[in-house]
Design a protein with these regions (language model features):
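Structural micro-motif
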Residues: 32, 72, 78-87
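CheY-like receiver
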Residues: 119-136
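N-terminal "domain-start" segment that seeds a small globular fold
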Residues: 6-25, 60-62
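Short cysteine clusters
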Residues: 41-44
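Non-catalytic, surface beta->alpha helical segment in thiol-disulfide oxidoreductase systems
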Residues: 87-121
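Conserved helix-turn-beta segment immediately C-terminal to the redox Cys motif
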Residues: 31-33, 46-66, 72
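Short active-site neighborhood of thiol/selenol oxidoreductases, capturing the structured segment around
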Residues: 28-39
Length: 136
């Protein structure tokens, strides 16, 4: 007897919407890539499949999308003046920011570099810079 084939569809959201409310928690741990975009932005639509593809390939990384129209204050806090803008964090430390639609190879290269970082050194330098900025 042949049974009808059932198809199971797993709805896995590969990217996360980042808002002012979930931003700090979202960038706190691990590697995080943020894509600042807007619906009216042509280059943003060209970059979207690259970003989505990387998110599906690297499930251990948080891929967040920031709608600059809905989250104007958040975009302003990053100084975003051109979109798309890609921002990278590791363990809560901002490490990279670049405007423009990057090709897939550049995104993969960035991910490789983020994975290879010695975070002990990075944390020490980050704390030193933070203390200097606060006048300590």
């Amino acid at each position: 007897m042949e049974y009808p084939r059932s198809e199971v569809v797993i709805n896995r959201m590969a990217t996360t919407e980042i808002t002012s409310q979930n931003h700090d928690q979202s960038v706190a741990d691990g590697i995080v890539l943020l894509d600042f975009w807007a619906d009216w932005c042509g280059p943003c639509h060209m970059f979207a499949p690259v970003f989505e593809g990387a998110s599906e390939k690297h499930s251990d990384i948080t891929f967040g999308k920031v709608d600059t129209e809905a989250e104007q204050d958040l975009a302003a806090s990053y100084g975003v003046q051109s979109i798309p803008t890609l921002v990278a964090y590791r363990d809560g430390i901002p490490l990279f920011s670049q405007a423009g639609a990057l090709p897939a190879e550049a995104v993969e290269d960035l991910i490789g570099q983020l994975r290879a970082l010695d975070m002990t050194e990075i944390r020490a330098e980050y704390e030193k810079q933070k203390a200097a900025a606060e006048g300590r």
